[in-house]
Each structure stands twice: as structure tokens, then as C-alpha cells.
A protein has these predicted regions:
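Active-site-adjacent structural segments surrounding the nucleophilic cysteine of cysteine proteases
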Residues: 1-124
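A glycine-rich, coil/turn loop motif that links secondary-structure elements
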Residues: 85, 125-129, 155
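A structural signal for well-ordered alpha-helical scaffolds and beta->alpha junctions
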Residues: 92, 128-132, 220
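Hydrophobic residues in alpha-helical segments
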Residues: 117, 156-159, 216
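Mid-length scaffold segments of soluble, non-membrane domains
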Residues: 119-148
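Active-site-adjacent substructure of cysteine-protease-like catalytic cores
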Residues: 148-192
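Noncatalytic regulatory segments and standalone regulatory/sensor domains
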Residues: 186-232
């Protein structure tokens, strides 16, 4: 039973699958996440203990990646709500990476950060990850100055004014079933680098947030929300 009614560059596009990324505004998407955030269940006994025990399995890899978490798919032994970090932890990973980029330290442990988002930010017990605005609230609560927008035309200015960024996007602007992903963007010598978006994604330079959106996931991604973070 097909639901395709047009093509994009030779690709069949399903009206049903593309409806949310194509037709629903970013602000409405953020509002939906906020509603689910407020309705969230917050009691996940045992997760912090298991995560503290298992995080040591990843320390060598983090060291090899210059202090960043890059290989989310390896985190099948750490939990966020009722899911694993490998399934739904990208927002927390992006936050962890951004704070490390800004401070050069891991003062907040990754398991403790997961625990904090389980108390405020988790959506559908982890099935939908973390509400994007909860990331900004977390950063503010930990003393970071932020600027944010869901309007693409404002992104490059935010990129220029920020020291690190966190971008939430649809993996596929034509297929909501390919889910949402959140990445940390770091800056060096007026170039932008993305973290935790596939094998050694941090090695490829970009030249603006617009450039990232044009090229990431072969141009198939679509923005939802950008947070810029400014060093204290």
C-alpha cells in the first residue's frame, strides 16, 4: 500500500512520512516535545548504578577521541530511561561534548548527566530521547550563557557569536521514521566540526551552520533547533 505522491531528485517521497518535517513548524515540534517532557515518568531505579559501573568501559575510546564521545552505537551497556544510550542518548552526548569543548574538563560525569536528564528532559521514557529545550535549560542551570533559535535564517549569526553549539535536526527531511538526531558543533580557526554523527565525523570541516545543513546526511537532514553556547 503506497503513500507516495511525488519525487525529490529521483527519490519517491511519502506524504505521510514527510508530513511532520515538511509541514509542521519547528516551534510546534518544540512545543510537542515540551508537552511530552512535562508528562514524563522520572523514576528509573538502577540506571545510575549501572551507568556508573559501565561507563569505565568507554573511557579509553573517549581518550582516543580527544575527550569527546563519538561512537554512540557502542553505548549499549548504558541506559537512559527504559532505552539504551545507543538508541536515544544523542542529546546528552551532545551536551557532554559541548561542555567538555568549552571547559576542557569532565567535571560533570556522563552517568550523572544522564541521571539529571532523567529527572527533567526525558521524553517517553527515552523512546523520543530528550526535549531540545531541556538541553538549553540544563546548560543555563549549570551556569552557561546561551542563545537559541528555531529559525534557519538566524543560525549563521548564532554560529558566529557562539563558542560551541548544539543542533537538533531531522535525519531525513522526507521521512520522520528516520528519527531526530542532535549533534555538538565545535569551532576552530573559523571552521565548524560536528561530533557523534558517524565514523570520524569530527575530521571534516564546515564553514557555517548553513554549510552543515547543506551537506550533513548528504543534504537530506532538516533543522529543528540550534543552541549557541558562549564561554563564561
Amino acid at each position: 500500500m503506497g503513500n507516495s505522491d511525488h519525487k525529490s531528485e529521483g527519490r519517491e517521497v511519502s506524504f505521510f512520512r514527510s508530513f511532520i518535517p515538511q509541514k509542521i513548524s519547528n516551534e510546534k515540534t518544540l512545543t510537542f516535545f515540551e508537552l511530552l517532557r512535562k508528562m514524563a515518568f522520572h523514576n528509573f531505579p538502577g540506571n545510575l548504578e549501572k551507568n556508573n559501573a559501565n561507563f569505565k568501559n568507554h573511557l579509553k575510546e573517549i581518550e582516543e577521541n580527544n575527550g569527546y564521545i563519538e561512537e554512540q552505537h557502542n553505548y549499549t551497556d548504558m541506559y537512559y530511561g527504559n532505552k539504551t544510550i545507543s538508541f536515544c542518548g544523542c542529546e546528552i552526548i551532545a551536551t557532554y561534548n559541548a561542555i567538555y569543548d568549552l571547559t576542557g574538563k569532565h567535571d560533570i560525569s556522563f552517568p550523572e548527566m544522564i541521571n539529571e536528564f532523567e529527572k527533567d528532559g526525558i521524553v517517553l521514557s527515552g523512546f523520543f530521547g530528550t526535549a531540545p529545550r531541556a538541553i538549553e535549560d540544563y546548560l543555563k542551570n549549570h551556569g552557561f550563557k546561551t542563545i537559541s533559535s528555531s529559525k534557519k535564517e538566524e543560525y549563521d549569526k548564532i554560529g558566529e557569536e557562539s563558542d560551541a553549539l548544539i543542533l537538533t535536526l531531522y535525519n531525513d527531511k522526507y521521512d520522520i521514521f528516520n528519527m531526530v538526531h542532535t549533534i555538538n558543533i565545535t569551532k576552530k580557526d573559523n571552521k565548524y566540526y560536528i561530533h557523534n554523527n558517524g565514523y570520524k565525523s569530527y575530521l571534516e570541516p564546515y564553514y557555517s551552520i548553513t554549510d552543515i545543513l547543506l551537506r550533513i546526511n548528504d543534504g537530506e537532514a532538516k533543522d529543528i533547533f540550534l543552541i549557541g553556547i558562549i564561554k563564561n
